[in-house]
Amino acid sequence: MNPLNPSSDGIKENLLTLLAQKAYRFGDFSLASGKKSSHYVNCKPVSLSGPGLLSISSLFLKQINESDSGVAGLTLGADPLVSGVVILAAQSGIDLNGLIVRKEAKGHGTGAWLEGPLPPKGSVITVLEDVVTTGGSSLKAVEQLRNQGYLVKQVLAIVDREEGGLDAISKADLELNSLFFLKEIVERANSLQ
């Protein structure tokens, strides 16, 4: 089997196990949203590993519309996701631009919010996200992209914690598509103990 073309179901199952083993923790945590939780998911140990990023990128690429000109996300969590999808797209003969959205405007030079090859205004960009809780990070990226004249219709996330992110993203006239819900990762982690 070609490692770039295994079945989506097999990729997803393997990725779920990786997330349960390397990204999920149980305890007392403060989330970026300010909420407290006993479940914590840090996708970076998976998205910054070769097998993890290849799996995520493959699954994301299958959900990107042919009319999209690029993918983007808020630094730092989306940096490997954007890079992985763009590389895999290029290997598949698909021309996608990768954009990184800064958390604040660059303090020197052009003062840019966006880094990367900027497609023409009006281009459709899909936002990539590691974990969606309230949707705040995704919406910050969407806001900056829309302010620059891009159309954003969809957010792709590795994990949806199901804590209001879907509602917030839907209210911004966006679709949220997640590879997993937090409960799936918790169930897999519990089954591996």
Curated annotation (Swiss-Prot):
Keyword Glycosyltransferase assigned = yes
Question: Mind telling me which Gene3D superfamilies this protein's record contains?
Answer: 3.40.50.2020
Q: Residues that bind orotate, according to the entry? A: T133, R161
Q: What class of enzyme is it?
A: transferase
EC number(s) on file: 2.4.2.10
UniProt: 5-phospho-alpha-D-ribose 1-diphosphate binding residues: R102, K103, K106, H108, E129, D130, V131, V132, T133, T134, G135, G136, S137
Entry's Gene Ontology BP terms? 'de novo' UMP biosynthetic process; pyrimidine nucleobase biosynthetic process
Q: What catalytic activity does the UniProt entry give for this protein?
A: orotidine 5'-phosphate + diphosphate = orotate + 5-phospho-alpha-D-ribose 1-diphosphate
Q: Which cofactors is this protein said to need?
A: Mg(2+)
According to its UniProt record, in which pathway does this protein act?
Pyrimidine metabolism; UMP biosynthesis via de novo pathway; UMP from orotate: step 1/2
Q: Does the keyword Glycosyltransferase apply?
A: yes
The UniProt entry, under PANTHER family, shows: OROTATE PHOSPHORIBOSYLTRANSFERASE, URIDINE 5'-MONOPHOSPHATE SYNTHASE
Give the multimer and partner information.
Answer: Homodimer.
| Functional description taken from the UniProt entry | Catalyzes the transfer of a ribosyl phosphate group from 5-phosphoribose 1-diphosphate to orotate, leading to the formation of orotidine monophosphate (OMP).
Q: What is this protein called?
A: Orotate phosphoribosyltransferase
The organism encoding this protein is Prochlorococcus marinus (strain NATL1A)
